[in-house]
Amino acid sequence: MNVYAAIDLMSGKVVRLKEGKAENITVYSENPLTVIRRLYDEGFERFHIVDLDAALGIGDNFNIISEMLKEKGYKQVAGGIRDVQKIKKYIDSGADRVVLSTLAFVNPQSLLPMKDKITISLDVKDEIVSYEGWKKDSGLKLNEALSKFSEMGFEEFIVTSINRDGTMKGFDRKIAQSIPFEYRKKVLLSGGVLLNEIKEIEMLGYKGCIIGKDLYEKYFGDA
C-alpha cells in the first residue's frame, strides 16, 4: 500500500489547517526542504505536496515546490492547479503526478491526454463532493463521481473527508465502507488518518492513504 506524507505549504512554511480553515493554522517548520529530507530519512518515500496559497487564490509556492521536487522520493503536487499549462509546468519540474479537483469538474476533457499523470481529488462533506477549495458543490455523490471519472479513464483518486481533515480523529470509516471494492484499489484515503490506522486501511483494500497532522505531531511536535 502507498503511504503518503502530506506537506502543506503556506507563505513558504510547512503548516497544517484544521478542516481546511486558514484561521485554524499550525506552523510546523519554516523550511520545507528540511521537512521533506527528515521524513525521507524516517522512511517515508512518497509525498503529497499541497500549495495552500494557490488553492485559496492568495499566491503560490511554485519556487519552493520546484526545489522540493529535486529531492528524493515519489512526489505528487496539489493545490490551485486549474489550467493545463500549470499541470505541464509541474510535470516538467519533476512531479510524478499532479492532483486536481476544480479542473476535473469544469473541463475534464482537457485532462485526458495527461490522464496517466493525473490524480483526481474528491473532497466529501455530507456525502457530496465539493471543489474549488471546498467552496463549490459538485452536486455529485462520492460514488457517482468515482464512476464518472473512472469511465473516462482516470485511474487514481484521493478521497478526503472534509470534516476529518487536520483533526487527528482517525479516517472516516463511514466513507471508507461506502466505496465499492472495485474503486478502492484506485483510491488514496485522506482526512484525519492516523499512523496506527495504516494496516486497517490496507486490509479494507485501498490503494493507499495520506497522513498529515499525526505525522507532524510525532516528528515535529516541538516546532
Predicted feature locations:
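Structural preference for beta-strand elements that scaffold enzyme active sites
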Residues: 2-6, 46, 74-78, 96-99, ...
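Conserved anion-binding
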Residues: 10-23, 95-165
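Short, acidic/polar
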Residues: 28-40, 83-89, 137-148, 198
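Glycine-rich, proline-tolerant flexible connector loops at the mouths of alpha/beta enzymes
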Residues: 46-60, 64, 158-169
